A protein has these predicted regions:
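Walker A/P-loop
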Residues: 1
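Residue-level marker for buried hydrophobic side chains located in beta-strands
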Residues: 9, 140-141
Length: 169
């Protein structure tokens, strides 16, 4: 709190939960696999209130497409999912909003948030410009720093197999 705003980055959901429980001011960000996809639920005619059933059927945000390319007037157009809210716009209680993005946006706009390594690296590598005003926090604390190297390699590493090398000899 001393610095005014921060990111805390940790390796596991259990640590995120522990931090969030102990430090109530932290807003956690969980991955897409932890949330039911409203779009897929809609397609399967599952009530929005029945997220437990959707999760049991594997209808997670990880599997739903947030952006699709469609044809309009002979041109390819990218369309966002109707449930994906826009960051910075006031919350509309009359409209269903994606649970994953709601919690992610709450964390981005909160002074202090807690992320897992994969989500944090994803944010900083691919979405830094899109969320520029929200990611310029003065401090990032990496818990379990002894795992940082492994986490970076897991995020951006390349697997090289002997079969591929044999082809070039």
């Amino acid at each position: 709190r001393y610095f005014g705003s921060s990111f805390i980055v940790t390796a596991s959901k259990q640590l995120q939960d522990q931090y969030s429980k102990d430090l109530k001011f932290l807003m956690p960000v969980k991955g897409k696999s932890n949330f039911a996809c409203l779009k897929l639920m809609d397609q399967e005619s599952i009530l929005k209130s029945n997220t437990k059933s959707a999760m049991q059927k594997g209808l997670t945000c990880e599997k739903g497409l947030c952006e699709e390319t469609t044809m309009k007037n002979g041109k390819k157009v990218k369309e966002s999912c109707q449930f994906k809210p826009k960051l910075g716009e006031p919350h509309d209680d009359t409209k269903d909003s994606c649970y994953y993005y709601e919690q992610k946006y709450r964390a981005l706009t909160s002074p202090h948030s807690i992320w897992n390594y994969a989500a944090y690296f994803q944010l900083m590598k691919f979405n830094r410009k899109a969320y520029a005003e929200y990611v310029s926090k003065p401090i990032a604390i990496f818990d379990e720093a002894d795992n940082v190297e492994d986490q970076i390699i897991q995020f951006s590493g390349v697997d090289i197999y002997n079969e591929y090398l044999a082809e070039y000899n």
